[in-house]
Structure formats: C-alpha cells, structure tokens
Amino acid sequence: MDPFITEGIPEEYAILGIGDIHLRVRYTEPTQKILEDYYGFKKYNKFKFYDRKVTLFRFEENLFKHEIHIIEDKDSAVERNGVGGIHHIAFGVKDIEDLKELQEKIEEKNYFNSGIKNREFMISSYFREANHLLFETATPLIKDKKIIPEQKNNFDEIPLFLPKFLENRRERIEKNINFKF
C-alpha cells in the first residue's frame, strides 16, 4: 500500500507506516529463516536485552524500511490472543504470481496454511510457522472505487469497509469497534 499523501503534511513529516515489530519467540531460527528466505529481510544486528537475545532484521527494498526484532524467550508462556497479543503479522507481495510462488514454498515445507483466499480488496494466504505465529501475505490493494472508499483527511469520515462475507456481521463488528476499554 502506498502512503497517504496530503497537501497539509509535508512528506518528511508524514507517518509512513509502523516502525518496528517485536516478535517474542521460543525458537528464533525458524522465524529468522522465514523472514530471510520468504520475505527478503536481512539480519543486521544482534544484542542482549537483559538476559534475552535479540536479532534485528530490516527490509530495505521499500519506502517504509520495515524492521523486525526477534526476541528469544524460552521462559514466558506462549502468547494467546487477547489484550497484548497480536493475531497475525502481514506482509505484501508485488502481485498474484509472487503470492502463488510463495504458496508453493509454504506447501513444500508442509506449513499449516489457508491456501490462497480472495478477500475482495486483496488476495491473501495465511500460514503458521514453528513458533505458532500466523503470517499473512497479500497482494496490493485492488484500487476499485466501487470496492474501497476514498481516503479522507478526517479519520472519522471514513466509512467502515467490510468484504461481502462479513456484511452479515456488520452490526456486531461496529458495536465491538466502538467498545471502550
């Protein structure tokens, strides 16, 4: 996805994306291998944070300069979904052909996976790796005006877009979005 550029904010001050992602895992090697072999991340630093080994990876091939910190943690309980946990980590590919190529690699390694799914606004594949992290890989957004609403300057003016398969749950989803902790 391209960054949202507006006249009111010069590009050098714009928020372009998420800074770092920290993945706390028991076994670092399987996750590191996926980042390097499947997504093109490069290991660029290692250090200790208290008693934990941390390995830093960077993706230099795009505007966002994504960075992932893998923290080795053999002591903490395995993460469960809920407050403080993440459901999945998402990556992008250039097109459907790249996604199909990645899907073949995933199936060759026998990762538990979803297969390729049409999500209306993008096409995705999901798989779980050895540390039980769920990886999503998606094509770029389909920029069809009928499917995706225009971006607005004010966040509260953007209508909630749901794919057709979730429309029957719209009321419940909107209620949960408005939930205050």
Where are each of the predicted segments found?
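Glyoxalase I/VOC metalloenzyme domain signal
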Residues: M1-F47, F59-F112, F127-F181
